[in-house]
């Protein structure tokens, strides 16, 4: 049984003003869907699932596409060892595509993730 488009869309619409985009990293198909959704109708803001410290370097790198790059932020883990947090800047990344389209369409962006010194991975249990 096929799911109608309006039913599928309503699953991700929390209110008339808030809509969710589920993302799959590294999927060109998902990046294309993000592009189409952002250009099909008007949005007030794009919530970016990254901390505000990524905003300036990431948006500069997005303006430099088609050059693929990576944004790297040095950090320390719980034991104090050097580690990094990184974001690949590739148009096949749905987050990058969303930022790219939002910048081109004049849609404001809000970087909404917390700034953390140590990221503790939480294993997914199915």
Task: State where each predicted segment sits.
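Compositional signal for N-terminal targeting/processing segments
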Residues: 1-126
